[in-house]
Amino acid sequence: MARVKYGKVTRARRKRWIKLAKGYFGTKKSSYKKAHEQVIRSMAYAFIGRKERKRDFRSLWIVRINAAVRPEGLSYSTFMHGLKLANININRKMLSELAINNSEEFKQIVQQAKKALNK
C-alpha cells in the first residue's frame, strides 16, 4: 500500500486556526499551538459574552426607566406595577427608548400608570 502524507491537509487545517487568531498579540497569532489555545478560549469568552449582553442591556433599560420615572414621583418597581394594573404591555427596551427620545409620550404612559395605582 502507498504511503499517505497529510502535509497539505494539516497545513490547511492549521492555517484555518491561525487565520482565526488574526489580531492577537505575540506568538498567539503566529504559533499554531498558542493560536489554537487562544482561539478556543476566545470562543468560550464570546459564548459567555453573548449571554451577558442580554443581562447588561436589560439592566441598562431598567436604569434608564428608573431615571425617567423618578422626577414623576415614582420608583421603577411601582411604575412597572402600575403598568401591569393599567394593562399596558410595553417591554423595557421600548420604554427606555420612549423615555430618551419621546419624553412627552413617556409622561403620558407614566400618568396612566399613576391613575391605575390610585384606583
Swiss-Prot record:
Keyword hit for Repeat: no
For this protein, the record's InterPro entries field holds: Ribosomal_bL20, RIBOSOMAL_L20_CS, Ribosomal_protein_bL20_C
| CDD domains registered for this protein in UniProt | Ribosomal_L20
In terms of Pfam families, this protein maps to: Ribosomal_L20
Q: Which UniProt keywords apply?
A: Ribonucleoprotein, Ribosomal protein, RNA-binding, rRNA-binding
| Cellular component terms per the entry's GO annotation | ribonucleoprotein complex; ribosome
Q: Name one GO biological process term.
A: ribosomal large subunit assembly
Q: Which residues form the signal peptide?
A: none
Q: Which domain of life is it from?
A: Bacteria
Could you tell me which PROSITE patterns the record lists for this protein? RIBOSOMAL_L20 (PS00937)
Q: Sum up the protein's function in the record's words.
A: Binds directly to 23S ribosomal RNA and is necessary for the in vitro assembly process of the 50S ribosomal subunit. It is not involved in the protein synthesizing functions of that subunit.
Q: Fetch the PANTHER family from UniProt.
A: 39S RIBOSOMAL PROTEIN L20
Family the entry assigns = Belongs to the bacterial ribosomal protein bL20 family.
Record's protein name: Large ribosomal subunit protein bL20
Q: Which organism is it from?
A: Mycoplasma capricolum subsp. capricolum (strain California kid / ATCC 27343 / NCTC 10154)
